[in-house]
C-alpha cells in the first residue's frame, strides 16, 4: 500500500500520457505518484522529469477523463516496485503487474525496484551451457546459451508469436537437477494474440512454470515502458533468490520503442534517427543488460527479445541498436515463410556469438561445432547455386553441384522445418544433420574430422550397428 506523502492540486497541463504539476517541492526523478480523480478513481504514475518547482509525470493507466481542476496528485517518495513471490509462477498479469487470470492478488515475499539492483561488471560470470529449445535451426545452428541475450528479428505477418510460444513451451536445460522457469512479457499485442498465448501456455501445462505479463494494444502506450522491467525484476528474483534458470521472452520490442518515441515526442525532445529519442540505445541497454549470470549464484537469466523490423529493414534503428547490445540474432525469412516452411529461420544471416561456449563435448556432443559449420557451408553453397541456376540453367551444373542443390532443398524442408508441436532433442537434431550431409560426397565434408565421419555418418553408423 502506497503511503501518502505531499499532495498537490496544481496540475497545469495534460497532454498525451503526461501531466505537468506546478509548485512542487522535493520531488525526485523516478518517484511513484498516486493520482486521484474527482470520482475517487486512483491511478499510478511516475516522475519523468523534476525541476525546482515543476514535475512532469507519466500516467500508467492513461490520462483519459483527467481534469486539470479536480485531479489531485500525491508524491509518495518511493520508486516503482513490483511485489514478488514464488506464487507468481502459473499466473497471468497485465502490463503493470495486476492479476488478470481471475486469481487472488499476490501476497508478496518482497517488493523489488523495477529497474533492478546495480550489478558490478566484475561480479558477472561468463555465459555458458546449452539451453535446448527443441527447434533444430536454433539448437543445431545458432545455439542459445545460459545467460545470453539472443534476439529474434522478424517482420510483420511472420509467425514470431508461434515461435515465441513454442520456445516458451519447450525450452529446458539438460539435467534434471536444474529448476527452469519462463517469464513471458508481451507489449502492445491484440486480444487475439493475448488469447493465443494464454491458450498455448494453459493447454500444454507450460503455465505451471511460467509468469506472463500481457500489455494489450488498447492499453496506454506508457505501460509498455514498464512491462519488460516488471518481467525482468521477477526473473531476477527467481534466478538469484531461488537459483532458477530463467528464460525471459520479450515481444514485441518494436512496440516498446514506439512507446518510447511517443513519450519523447510528448516531451518535445529533439528527435534522433527516424524520430526515435537519441537515448534509445541507452534505454534498450537497461533492459538487455539485465540478462546474465552472477558469480556465486546458480541461477541465470537468458533473454530472447522479439522485434518486428519495419519494412523488413534490418538497418532500422530498433534492430540496428539491438544488434549492438545483444549477442547475435535469429532472423526470420519472408521467402521461407512463402514456401510454407515453419519456423522460417534463415540460418545464414542468423548468428549466436556465444554458441561456441555452450556446445561440444560435455555440453551437447563432440561433433556439434564441426557439424554445424559443415551444414552452414553446404547450405550456403546450395543457396548460391540456386542463383546460378536462374542464369545458366541446371543442365550446366556438375553432378556435385546438383547434390548441393538437393541438399539445400532438403535442409529447408527437413532440418529447418518442423511441426509447431515438435520438440526435437539436440541429439535428434545432430543426427538429422548427418542424414542430410549423407546427400553429399564424403570428399566434400572438409570441415568435419575423419573420426567424426566414421562415428556419426549414417553409412558407417549403420555398418557399426
Swiss-Prot record:
One of its GO terms (molecular function) is ATP binding. GO terms for cellular component: plasma membrane; proton-transporting two-sector ATPase complex, catalytic domain. InterPro entries: ATP-synt_VA_C, ATPase_a/bsu_AS, ATPase_A1-cplx_bsu, ATPase_F1/V1/A1_a/bsu_N, ATPase_F1/V1/A1_a/bsu_N_sf, ATPase_F1/V1/A1_a/bsu_nucl-bd, P-loop_NTPase, V-ATPase_su_B/beta. Its main location: membrane. It is a peripheral membrane protein. It is found in: Cell membrane. The keyword Transport applies. Keywords: ATP synthesis, Cell membrane, Hydrogen ion transport, Ion transport, Membrane, Transport. PROSITE patterns: ATPASE_ALPHA_BETA. Disulfide bonds: none annotated. It holds the Pfam family ATP-synt_VA_C. GO terms for biological process: proton motive force-driven plasma membrane ATP synthesis. Component of the A-type ATP synthase that produces ATP from ADP in the presence of a proton gradient across the membrane. The B chain is a regulatory subunit. Has multiple subunits with at least A(3), B(3), C, D, E, F, H, I and proteolipid K(x). Belongs to the ATPase alpha/beta chains family. This is A-type ATP synthase subunit B. It comes from Thermococcus kodakarensis (strain ATCC BAA-918 / JCM 12380 / KOD1).
Amino acid at each position: 500500500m502506497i503511503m501518502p506523502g505531499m499532495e498537490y492540486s496544481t496540475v497545469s497541463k495534460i497532454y498525451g500520457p503526461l501531466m505537468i504539476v506546478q509548485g512542487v517541492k522535493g520531488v525526485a526523478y523516478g518517484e511513484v505518484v498516486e493520482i486521484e480523480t474527482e470520482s475517487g478513481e486512483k491511478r499510478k504514475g511516475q516522475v519523468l522529469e523534476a525541476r525546482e518547482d515543476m514535475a512532469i509525470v507519466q500516467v500508467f493507466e492513461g490520462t483519459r477523463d483527467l481534469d486539470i481542476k479536480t485531479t489531485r496528485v500525491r508524491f509518495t517518495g518511493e520508486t516503482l516496485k513490483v511485489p514478488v513471490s514464488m506464487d507468481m509462477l502459473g499466473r497471468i498479469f497485465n502490463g503493470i503487474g495486476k492479476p488478470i487470470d481471475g486469481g487472488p492478488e499476490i501476497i508478496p515475499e518482497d517488493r523489488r525496484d523495477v529497474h533492478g539492483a546495480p550489478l558490478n561488471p566484475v561480479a558477472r560470470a561468463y555465459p555458458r551451457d546449452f539451453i535446448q529449445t527443441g527447434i533444430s535451426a536454433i539448437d543445431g545452428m545458432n545455439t542459445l546459451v545460459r545467460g545470453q541475450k539472443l534476439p529474434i528479428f522478424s517482420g510483420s505477418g511472420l509467425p514470431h508469436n508461434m515461435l515465441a510460444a513454442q520456445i516458451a513451451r519447450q525450452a529446458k536445460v539438460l539435467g534434471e537437477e536444474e529448476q527452469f522457469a519462463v517469464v513471458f512479457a508481451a507489449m502492445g499485442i491484440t486480444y487475439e494474440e493475448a488469447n493465443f498465448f494464454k491458450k498455448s501456455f494453459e493447454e500444454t501445462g507450460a503455465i505451471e512454470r511460467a509468469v506472463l505479463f500481457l500489455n494489450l494494444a488498447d492499453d496506454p502506450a506508457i505501460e509498455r515502458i514498464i512491462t519488460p522491467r516488471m518481467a525482468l525484476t521477477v526473473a531476477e528474483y527467481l534466478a538469484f533468490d531461488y537459483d532458477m534458470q530463467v528464460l525471459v521472452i520479450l515481444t514485441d520490442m518494436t512496440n516498446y520503442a514506439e512507446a518510447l518515441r511517443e513519450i519523447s515526442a510528448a516531451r518535445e525532445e529533439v528527435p534522433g534517427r527516424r524520430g526515435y529519442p537519441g537515448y534509445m540505445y541507452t534505454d534498450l541497454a537497461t533492459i538487455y543488460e539485465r540478462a546474465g549470470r552472477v558469480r556465486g549464484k546458480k541461477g541465470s537469466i537468458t533473454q530472447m527479445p522479439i522485434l518486428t523490423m519495419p519494412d523488413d529493414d534490418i538497418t532500422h534503428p530498433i534492430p540496428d541498436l539491438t544488434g549492438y547490445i545483444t549477442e547475435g540474432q535469429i532472423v526470420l525469412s519472408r521467402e521461407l515463410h512463402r514456401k510454407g516452411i515453419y519456423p522460417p529461420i534463415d540460418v545464414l544471416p542468423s548468428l549466436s556469438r556465444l554458441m561456441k561456449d555452450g556446445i561440444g563435448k560435455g555440453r551437447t556432443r563432440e561433433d556439434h561445432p564441426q557439424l554445424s559449420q559443415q551444414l552452414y557451408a553446404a547450405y550456403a553453397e546450395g543457396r548460391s547455386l540456386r542463383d546460378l541456376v536462374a542464369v545458366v540453367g541446371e543442365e550446366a551444373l556438375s553432378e556435385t553441384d546438383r547434390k548441393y542443390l538437393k541438399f539445400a532443398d532438403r535442409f529447408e524442408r527437413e532440418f529447418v522445418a518442423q511441426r509447431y508441436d515438435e520438440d526435437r532433442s539436440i541429439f535428434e537434431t545432430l543426427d538429422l544433420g548427418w542424414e542430410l550431409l549423407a546427400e553429399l560426397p564424403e570428399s566434400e565434408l572438409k570441415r568435419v574430422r575423419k573420426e567424426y565421419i566414421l562415428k556419426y555418418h549414417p553409412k558407417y553408423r549403420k555398418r557399426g550397428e
